[in-house]
From Swiss-Prot:
Disordered as annotated region, ranges: 253-306, 459-478, 558-578
Name of the protein: tRNA (adenine(58)-N(1))-methyltransferase non-catalytic subunit trm6
Feature: compositional bias, Polar residues: 297-306, 558-567
InterPro entries: TRM6
Length: 578
């Protein structure tokens, strides 16, 4: 992530009213903040994040306003003064220890404020001190200000600052800020009411992390790491959260990206470089260079599974990536792959996959117009990319499955779980608990036991029937067993282990002596739940837990103890035999 504001970048502007405005900073433009005013965008380009600015009216400026950076001492001056005044102050208390000074006798209505609405509006037009003069006038004209407690006065001052102070803080736009902004201001239904804490829990239980950097030879020789299969109906929010955890969400800085880009290319040693420099330019050096083929990342990638012709990843535009016009320098250009359900289940029915464009010789290509030649290369590259992504996805061996969809989760897991590698994590989000409880029942221990017993019965029946037919193939018998099992069971419950349901919600509280309670203004909505399980590879052999039969029992040797004579004076009864 960049450390300062760059041109054409989306940033988050935190206003005094606690409202977050997401704005694209375009050069030579004006940013409007509603009642808080406006300012030129050029005045914050190149400045670091987390600075608080104050909008001042300045007639000398072209736009009529300028910005002033508020230092930390001034920003927290009110808090420091309030803490200093409260030190050593002793309040009068009653017999039970409660403070005598309360707000019960205060009637906070319009009659307590001498300033009228017309006078306040006139002060807004005349004052250029970013709202400080209005707040001071309101405090001077308040009749019951001296009767307020320190806590009530602090809340009153906070409300007036949020209403009249012309300040804003520039924050870098990350997934957490975007999630809270979508939940509070842009409609939570667009992201399935996925809260910030649930986004973190989804990535945690899905074991989403960076797969590590590996060279091309190592990736070919071994299995690539960090390959995740995603079903996202939140507009790309889940994909953005995963990419942030994997380190492929934000565009590279200019200098750093050039260094990383040059490291990916094969470097020549000093002798070869010197030899190339000494060679004079030849006629072949002016020949048209070969068009580079599109290379996709083999590891540390995200494969999005979607039901439409194109996936809905509109929220990725806030992080510099557009699906319609992708930037080739963005990390997601190589690490993000898309595949439809049709291409996964029946790829031959998709014309993009099955119909290969006509191959045109190079000699004929040079005679074509540039627009036709470019269209030909785009079709060939698109077909090659679709072929590669579909074949790679159908081969499976993914390291994790993340699902946040409005479809039935069981229908998604029926076809997606077999594509996972062993020990891969599965995390499914749902706003309500009912779809996930049904999913937990499908993968429960009782269903596993019934599935295994029924499979064993079918195999025994097939073996008895095939005893009369010695030419019967064993693989055909197994396929017939699976077909009959899938008719009775919706999915294979032996593919996932330890299904659990998770829930988490952050609730803000007001913490005061005797007045501690959750904030009444907190947002409601769906709780949100997560289903988690681990992919296992079931064995094809019958397992019988009979214990260790080779272990021998230990023999207990009893020794006879000699009897001793009993004294008559010991008080012990002795049986006398004649």
């Amino acid at each position: 992530m960049h450390s300062y504001v760059r041109p054409n970048q989306f940033v988050a502007l935190r206003l005094p009213s606690e409202f977050t405005k997401i704005q694209k900073i375009e050069p030579d433009s004006t940013v409007f903040l509603g009642k808080f005013g406006s300012f030129p965008a050029n005045q914050i380009i190149g400045r670091p994040f987390y600075l608080t600015f104050e909008i001042l009216d300045d007639a000398d400026e072209k736009d009529g306003s300028c910005l002033r950076i508020i230092p930390a001492a001034e920003l927290h001056a009110e808090t420091l003064i309030a803490e200093g005044e409260g030190d050593g102050e002793e309040l009068d208390t009653n017999e039970d220890g409660t403070p005598m000074r309360t707000n019960r006798e205060i009637v906070d209505d319009a009659s307590t404020q001498k300033l009228t609405w017309e006078e306040i509006e006139a002060l807004k037009k005349e004052s250029g001190g970013a709202g400080r003069e209005i707040i001071s006038k309101l405090l001077e004209s308040h009749q019951t200000l001296d009767q307020k407690t320190s806590f009530s006065l602090a809340k009153y001052m906070l409300r007036k600052r949020r209403k009249y102070m012309k300040r804003f803080t520039v924050l870098p736009l990350d997934v957490s800020i975007l999630t809270n902004h979508m939940m509070e201001d842009q409609g939570a239904a667009r992201i399935m009411e996925l809260r910030d804490e649930m986004v973190g829990l989804l990535g945690c239980w899905g074991n989403v992390h960076h797969g590590g950097d590996a060279s091309l030879d190592e990736a070919i020789a071994a299995k690539p790491n960090g390959r995740y299969l995603v079903v996202d109906d939140t507009g790309g929010l889940v994909v953005a959260a995963m990419a942030e955890r994997m380190g492929i969400l934000y565009p590279h800085d200019g200098d750093e990206y050039e260094e990383q880009g040059s490291s990916d290319e094969p470097k020549k040693n000093e002798a070869e470089q010197a030899h190339d420099d000494e060679q004079p330019p030849t006629e072949s050096s002016t020949h048209r260079p070969a068009r580079p083929a599109h290379m996709s990342a083999s590891g540390n990638s995200i494969t999005v599974l979607h039901p439409n012709k194109q996936p809905n990843l509109s929220l990725l535009k806030y992080f510099g990536y557009s699906q319609d016009n992708p930037d080739e320098t963005h990390p997601l250009h190589k690490h993000l792959k898309t595949i439809s359900w049709l291409q996964l289940l029946d790829p031959n029915a998709d014309p993009i996959y099955s119909e290969e464009p006509e191959i045109i010789p190079e000699s004929e290509l040079y005679t074509m117009k540039s627009n036709k030649r470019g269209a030909y290369y785009r079709k060939r590259n698109r077909w090659t990319r679709v072929q590669s992504v579909v074949n790679e996805a159908r081969a499976g061996e993914f390291d994790g499955l993340i699902v946040a969809t409005v479809m039935d989760p069981s229908s998604v897991l029926k076809y997606a779980v077999p594509l996972l590698a062993g020990s891969a994590h599965v995390a499914v989000y749902s706003p309500s608990i009912e779809p996930l409880t049904e999913l937990s029942d499908l993968y429960s221990t009782a269903k596993k036991t019934a599935f295994i017993n029924r499979r064993q019965q079918l195999r025994e029946q097939k073996l008895q029937q095939s005893s009369d037919q010695p030419d019967a193939n064993e693989t055909e018998l197994q396929d017939s067993d699976l077909s009959e099992l899938m008719a009775e069971f919706y999915l294979d419950p032996t593919l996932l282990l330890a299904p659990t349901l998770q829930n988490s919600r952050v609730r803000p509280w007001q913490v005061l002596p005797g007045r501690t309670h959750p904030l009444m203004s907190m947002r409601g909505g769906a709780e949100g739940y997560i289903f988690h399980a681990v992919r296992v590879i079931p064995t094809q052999q019958t397992i019988q837990a009979a214990g260790n039969l080779s272990r021998k029992k230990r023999k207990v040797v009893t020794q006879e103890t000699p009897t001793t004579a009993v004294d008559s004076g010991s008080g012990v009864d002795v049986e006398m035999k004649s």
